[in-house]
Amino acid sequence: MSAQKRVFLKVVILGDSGVGKTCLMNQFVNQKFSREYKATIGADFLTKDVVVDDKLVTLQLWDTAGQERFQSLGMAFYRGADCCVIVYNVNNSKSFDSVENWRQEFLYQTSQDECAFPFIIVGNQIDKDASKRAVSLHRALDYCKSKHGSNMIHFEASAKENTNVTDLFETVSRLALENESSRDDFVNDFSEPLLLSKPLNNTSSCNC
């Protein structure tokens, strides 16, 4: 791979508390899974370098709290996102019902074009007993199809068994890069560094 500018991409991961957002991140970044549940307070993020189409990409994966009392912080954490992942638990119908609320909250806070901005919907915890499943694959796909014209992809995964986790984040990386590339490329693209410490020539006689 030839030397070239590193691309930084921000990915926001949303969903109700306890659906496994942190577990998916840790499995992808650290290849670790913990059975212990610890609620995310506010937001946290992990980074991982990946190569997409011969480009070096640093993914910033933002894990946001699912509790309602932290949703007011959304604008600060959503700003600058290149892709949004919304996670639900296939064994919890309520968490799936919340998917559209999370999507609308993100769109409201960021003013993104809902037809163009990439969303990935993830049904997590498919490793559990199938008899306990509350959200069928058919139901989830029907939801995605109902958003005509939207840039939305659905995955099912298991953070515990590392099922589809790599494929999921490879798709996230590709969609985020495509979205970033579609915007005007003016950030960090100067031929020379800006010398902010250089004094300005003051030709004004005003002392104010």
UniProtKB/Swiss-Prot annotation:
Record's keyword annotation contains GTP-binding: yes
Statement: the UniProt record of this protein carries the keyword Nucleotide-binding: yes
GO cellular component, one term: cytosol
Transmembrane parts of this sequence: none
Compartments where found: Vacuole membrane
GO molecular function terms listed in the Swiss-Prot or TrEMBL record: GTP binding; GTPase activity
Activity regulation description: Rab activation is generally mediated by a guanine exchange factor (GEF), while inactivation through hydrolysis of bound GTP is catalyzed by a GTPase activating protein (GAP).
Phenotype seen when the gene is deleted: Contains large vacuoles.
UniProt motif (Effector region) ranges: 37-45
Entry-linked SMART domains: RAB (SM00175), RAN (SM00176), RAS (SM00173), RHO (SM00174)
UniProt keywords, alphabetically: GTP-binding, Lipoprotein, Membrane, Methylation, Nucleotide-binding, Prenylation, Protein transport, Transport, Vacuole
Binding site for GTP: 17-23, 33-40, 66, 124-127, 158-160
One BP annotation, GO: regulation of vacuole fusion, non-autophagic
Positions where Cysteine methyl ester occurs in the chain: C208
Lipidation positions, renumbered (S-geranylgeranyl cysteine): C206, C208
Source organism, top-level taxon: Eukaryota
Function of the protein: Ypt/Rab-type GTPases are key regulators of membrane trafficking and intracellular vesicular transport. They act as molecular switches that convert between GTP-bound and GDP-bound states, and regulate virtually all steps of membrane traffic from the formation of the transport vesicle at the donor membrane to its fusion at the target membrane. In the GDP-bound state, Ypt proteins are predominantly cytosolic, solubilized through the interaction with a GDP dissociation inhibitor (GDI).
Family: Belongs to the small GTPase superfamily. Rab family.
Protein's recorded name: Ypt/Rab-type GTPase ypt71
Gene coding for it: ypt71
